[in-house]
């Protein structure tokens, strides 16, 4: 892990009046960049030339850093270019996937918003389970391996893969049949299979809950809630049951979009309690904790119990559903507030208070 002192040494050489907010052109970059501009920051996007159109058309980026391929963002010349523009990187799922988690931890020497040490805790299922379970949250039962399957389960794989390759099954035979099918399609590798995470299949309504922990205020804020629109499962359910059986199509769970939702108000105490508990436990296990945005992906069962099956320890893709604010984020100040603008506002306040060390790593 890059020492915090080294990152702060780099930041101390910056022109503090010309900080640029930067991210990779993908995932949640539109509201990250737009939010930064609304707070008065200069912005830059890292992109390839064949994917720069959205950032030009929407006008969210002041500068463009072009790479031949996204994995080039970890190269030293790109890092130096970022440091030269006084960059603070806002990481999201695509940034971590392209840069590589090892590089983010050990070689990417550019100041980054949030706690880079916690990113591995969302990527590795055992660490994620340790944090979620240690927080006292209700999580699905975990199975040690396919031979232990004794009922409906969901099989997942590590990393920010947008649900690709996930599948449900009920027996060990079904597990291996689907594994072989996905390997034949090139969706899974032997390494993926070795790291398969098998958990109880919880029946309930899906809620992805987006929080922001402010280290400057020591407070967890509820920013918004969304649901995912997944292919092919959301298209498959439109097919009559008798036709589904005849077609014999195995559903996939690839995230193609998100839509905003509100949760019944009587569940909000539970929602806040979950966020508070996770933020508190994160401070203990991965100091300084869950800085900035995080997400708890949950299912609400018929007993109105929220079961958390996954977390994001950085800005989640579902925050795109409230680029102009959510029914919850607007309650804090009475203004539309995206997650991107909330991030930029925290950075701005940290600079004003000379407490930037509290929000970057």
UniProtKB/Swiss-Prot annotation:
Query: What Enzyme Commission number does this protein have?
Result: 6.3.4.23
* Catalysed reactions, as listed in the record: 5-amino-1-(5-phospho-beta-D-ribosyl)imidazole-4-carboxamide + formate + ATP = 5-formamido-1-(5-phospho-D-ribosyl)imidazole-4-carboxamide + ADP + phosphate
- Cofactor stoichiometry and binding? Binds 1 Mg(2+) or Mn(2+) ion per subunit.
| Keyword Magnesium (UniProt) | yes
> Where, in this chain's numbering, is 5-amino-1-(5-phospho-beta-D-ribosyl)imidazole-4-carboxamide bound?
27, 94, 258
Binding positions for ATP? 146-208, 230
Keyword Ligase carried by entry: yes
Q: Please report a single Pfam family linked to this protein.
A: DUF1297
Q: InterPro entries per the record? A: ATP_grasp_subdomain_1, IMP_biosynth_PurP, IMP_biosynth_PurP_C, IMP_biosynth_PurP_N, PreATP-grasp_dom_sf
Residues forming the ATP-grasp domain are 116-348
A GO MF annotation of the entry reads: magnesium ion binding
Q: Could you list this entry's UniProt keywords, alphabetically sorted.
A: ATP-binding, Ligase, Magnesium, Manganese, Metal-binding, Nucleotide-binding, Purine biosynthesis
Which NCBIfam families is this protein grouped with? Answer: PRK13278.1-5
Role of this protein:
Catalyzes the ATP- and formate-dependent formylation of 5-aminoimidazole-4-carboxamide-1-beta-d-ribofuranosyl 5'-monophosphate (AICAR) to 5-formaminoimidazole-4-carboxamide-1-beta-d-ribofuranosyl 5'-monophosphate (FAICAR) in the absence of folates.
Under which name does UniProt file this protein?
5-formaminoimidazole-4-carboxamide-1-(beta)-D-ribofuranosyl 5'-monophosphate synthetase
Q: Which organism is it from?
A: Methanococcus maripaludis (strain C7 / ATCC BAA-1331)
């Amino acid at each position: 892990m890059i020492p915090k002192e080294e990152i702060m040494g780099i930041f101390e050489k910056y022109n503090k009046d010309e900080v640029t907010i930067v991210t990779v052109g993908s995932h949640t970059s539109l509201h990250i960049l737009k939010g930064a501009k609304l707070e008065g920051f200069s912005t830059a996007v890292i992109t390839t030339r064949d994917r720069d159109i959205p950032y030009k058309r929407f006008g969210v980026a002041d500068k463009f850093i072009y790479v031949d391929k996204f994995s080039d963002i970890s190269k030293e010349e790109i890092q130096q270019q970022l440091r030269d523009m006084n960059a603070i990187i806002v990481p999201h799922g695509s940034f971590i996937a392209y840069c590589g988690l090892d590089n983010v931890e050990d070689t990417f020497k550019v100041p980054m918003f949030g706690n880079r040490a916690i990113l591995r805790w969302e990527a590795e299922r055992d660490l994620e389970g340790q944090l979620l379970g240690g927080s006292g949250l209700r999580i699905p039962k975990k199975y040690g391996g396919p031979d232990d399957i004794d009922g409906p389960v969901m099989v997942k794989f590590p990393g920010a893969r947008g649900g690709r390759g996930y599948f449900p099954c009920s027996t060990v035979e079904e597990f291996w049949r689907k594994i072989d099918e996905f390997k034949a399609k090139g969706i899974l590798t032997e390494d993926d299979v070795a790291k398969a995470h098998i958990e109880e299949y919880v029946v309930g309504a899906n809620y992805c809950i987006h929080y922001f922990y402010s280290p400057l205020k020591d407070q967890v804020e509820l920013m918004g809630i969304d649901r995912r629109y997944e292919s092919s499962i959301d298209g498959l359910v439109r097919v009559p049951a008798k036709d589904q059986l005849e077609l014999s199509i195995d559903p996939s769970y690839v995230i193609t979009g998100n839509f905003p939702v509100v949760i019944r108000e009587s569940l909000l105490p539970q929602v806040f309690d979950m966020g508070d508990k996770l933020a508190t436990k994160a401070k203990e296990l991965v100091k300084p904790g869950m800085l900035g945005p995080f997400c708890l992906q949950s299912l609400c069962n018929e007993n109105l119990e929220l079961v958390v099956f996954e977390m994001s320890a950085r800005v989640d893709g579902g925050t795109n559903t409230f680029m102009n604010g959510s029914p919850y984020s607007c309650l804090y100040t009475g203004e539309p507030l995206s997650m991107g603008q909330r991030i930029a506002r925290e950075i701005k306040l940290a600079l004003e208070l000379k407490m930037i060390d509290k929000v970057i790593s």
